[in-house]
Amino acid sequence: MDSDSCAAAFHPEEYSPTCKRRRTVEDFNKFCTFVLAYAGYIPYPKEELPLRSSPSPANSTAGTIDSDGWDTGFSDITPSVPDRCFSHLQPSLLQRAKPSNYLLDRKTTDKLKKKKRRKRRDSDIPVKEGFRESLLKLEAADPYVETPSSPTMQDIPQASADPCSGWDSDTPSSGSCATVSPDQVTEIKTEGKRTIVRQGKQVVFRDEDSTGNDEDIMVDSDDDSWDLVTCFCMKPFAGRPMIECNECHTWIHLSCAKIRKSNVPEVFVCQKCRDSKFDIRRSNRSRMGSRKLFLD
């Protein structure tokens, strides 16, 4: 490349098509925009400025030669060729050239969906908490306790007004139930889970068991067996439930025998009879062993 021919590029009237120049960053950017527009990634620029009028960077080595040399490289291609060849493809390319807008719309829709999900979760959380609190309250409440606010229990008279309520139908004295005034009903004491209530000449024992199967026991205090002592605990009958041993026919309190009133066995053997059987077997073994030694 001659210096004279390159120097002529500074004067447009002395421009020669044989002069070549170096490509600049601006030329590369223009080429990239053309390729992207051709591929459909970006739309075509609305106004294409003439390449010769674009100023070159101040720090470029070739100066204005760069702008003239870009036209020389594409001098054989007329500017109307892309418009003729690809004019029918421009609408489709413009439709394909909207991935960035589509992504933005998709992001906005995703954000809206996330917000809706958060609102639903926030609305579901207090409902779940209220349901759990109601369950905890129901579990904590005793199912056997009668609440005064319930409409069904308001019509039913309380147990203190009816002295016959809660008595066992199998007891002989339950048939002849006399009316007792509230003044005669006095609570004597409470022993553990048992409540002793005196109603005139009758005493009612009420056991508060967790199972709720135990019933009240009514015993006449004038009975001869009231002060009878038969159990091994050396305490009187006193109206407490008892069971008879099938071996020694001794009456023992259910509490001493560790038997629940809801689970009374048909055959019962007291602890003394069991121990005596064990002692008899052990003594027989010792006797047989001593006899064998004596015979030997």
Swiss-Prot record:
InterPro entries: PHD_PHF13 (IPR041947), Znf_FYVE_PHD (IPR011011), Znf_PHD (IPR001965), Znf_RING/FYVE/PHD (IPR013083). It comes from Mus musculus. Modulates chromatin structure and DNA damage response by regulating key determinants of chromatin compaction and DNA damage response. Binds H3K4me3-containing chromatin and promotes DNA condensation by recruiting corepressors such as TRIM28 and H3K9 methyltransferase SETDB1. Required for normal chromosome condensation during the early stages of mitosis. Required for normal chromosome separation during mitosis. Increases both chromatin-associated levels and activity of H3K9 methyltransferases, such as SETDB1, thus enhancing H3K9 trimethylation. The keyword NAD does not apply. Its main location: nucleus. Pfam families: PHD_5. Residues 51-73, 97-126, 145-183 are annotated as: Disordered. Interacts with histone H3 that is trimethylated at 'Lys-4' (H3K4me3). Interacts with GSK3B. Interacts with TRIM28. Interacts with SETDB1; the interaction probably enhances SETDB1 chromatin-associated levels and activity. The gene is Phf13. Disruption phenotype: Knockout mice are indistinguishable from wild-type littermates on the basis of appearance and breeding capacity. They have smaller testes and a reduced number of germ cells. Postpubertal homozygous mutant animals display a pronounced progressive loss of germ cells from an initially normal germ epithelium of the testis tubules leading to testis hypoplasia and early infertility. This is PHD finger protein 13. PANTHER family: HISTONE-LYSINE N-METHYLTRANSFERASE SET-26-RELATED, PHD FINGER PROTEIN 13. One of its GO terms (cellular component) is nucleus. One of its GO terms (biological process) is chromosome segregation.
